[in-house]
Amino acid sequence: MTTVRQRIDTQHRDAIHDAQLNIYGSRLATCGSDRLVKIFEVRPNGQSYPMAELVGHSGPVWKVSWAHPKYGGLLASASYDKKVIIWNEQQGRWQKAYEWAAHEASTTCVAFAPHQYGLMLASASADGDIGILRYDNSSNEWISSKIQKCHEQGVNSVCWAPGSADPAAKKRLVSAGNDKNVKIWAFDDATNEWILEKTLAGHTDFVREAAWCPVTNNGQHTIVSCGMEGNLVLFRTSNIETEEWKAKLLETAPCALYHSSFSPCGSFLSVAGDDNVITIWRENLQGQWIKVPRDNKEREGMSQAVGAPGAQR
């Protein structure tokens, strides 16, 4: 049974669009239509304390992303004002470290890459482009580039493939857009360009988010996407270099689905939709994704449906 561990009064003055914990679960970043980014300390005893209120955007802030802690306290935010802002914590104080305003429409998403890729982040925009920012240690500057015309009518989300200890492994990311497609992009070291590697079909309406599982299992990669038609689609490949991606429809919800996100260990998936409900999915030993019941009554119903006593797993 899933339970609410704690509630945090963020005191945002308008709708909250995103909330992200850092890798340790000790800090929470939130953002909203009030144009603010807020940071809270989250303690193991369930208590939370406000740490900072970051002011810098001139429009609603849609998304926040934490960098790996090896790079210090870095947080990125994406806003309707077309900007990506990177915030840096130094001696307990947060300040704007870098601002990038190269998109021509709302910046819908931002995501730091796994630390194996180096200090990098990707941004998605309603202008149809994906932005890439990479920190160059030799010049101590952020180097920017774009993957242009990725999705017609706009890009809604970007998510990086898990990092690899193999230095020869390709950098990859997945994007979701209003063209009803999920696309995988790979970086070509020879040409120094991002190449469209695969287009994945499974939606009949805008794809709101695509999440790449942060953990591989014996070389198996997993992506989950959700869309406005209510489809929750699982894509898998047993070998990303040689095998095709296979699609499986996990569910068609009775409402639009907006968000999908894996747990850090990759064994749980959360999905949020227009019905104000968050559903949790988990992968069983057979590699199948099943819903986690929200309460005991639902658990009993699921157990009866599969013909097993409620006490068994």
Curated annotation (Swiss-Prot):
GO molecular function annotations of the record: structural molecule activity
InterPro entries hit by this protein: Sec13/Seh1_fam, WD40/YVTN_repeat-like_dom_sf, WD40_repeat_dom_sf, WD40_rpt
Pfam families with a match to the protein in the record: WD40
WD repeat intervals: 11-50, 56-97, 102-143, 150-195, 202-245, 252-291
Keyword set, alphabetical order: Cell cycle, Cell division, Cytoplasmic vesicle, Endoplasmic reticulum, ER-Golgi transport, Lysosome, Membrane, Mitosis, mRNA transport, Nuclear pore complex, Nucleus, Protein transport, Repeat, Translocation, Transport, WD repeat
Gene3D superfamilies the record matches: YVTN repeat-like/Quinoprotein amine dehydrogenase
Predominant localisation class: membrane
Topology of this chain in the membrane: Peripheral membrane protein
Region (Disordered): 294-313
GO biological process: cell division; COPII-coated vesicle budding; embryo development ending in birth or egg hatching; mitotic chromosome centromere condensation; mRNA transport; nuclear transport; nucleus organization; positive regulation of division septum assembly
Any Gene Ontology CC annotation: lysosomal membrane
Location in the cell: Cytoplasmic vesicle, COPII-coated vesicle membrane; Endoplasmic reticulum membrane; Nucleus, Nuclear pore complex; Lysosome membrane
Xref: PANTHER family: NUCLEAR PORE COMPLEX PROTEIN SEC13 / SEH1 FAMILY MEMBER, PROTEIN SEC13 HOMOLOG
Family: Belongs to the WD repeat SEC13 family.
Entry function: Functions as a component of the nuclear pore complex (NPC) and the COPII coat. Required for the nuclear import of hcp-4 during mitotic prophase, this step is essential for centrosome assembly and resolution.
Assembly description: Component of a heterotertrameric COPII coat complex composed of npp-20 and sec-31. Probably part of the GATOR complex.
Protein name: Protein SEC13 homolog
Organism: Caenorhabditis elegans
Gene name per UniProt: npp-20
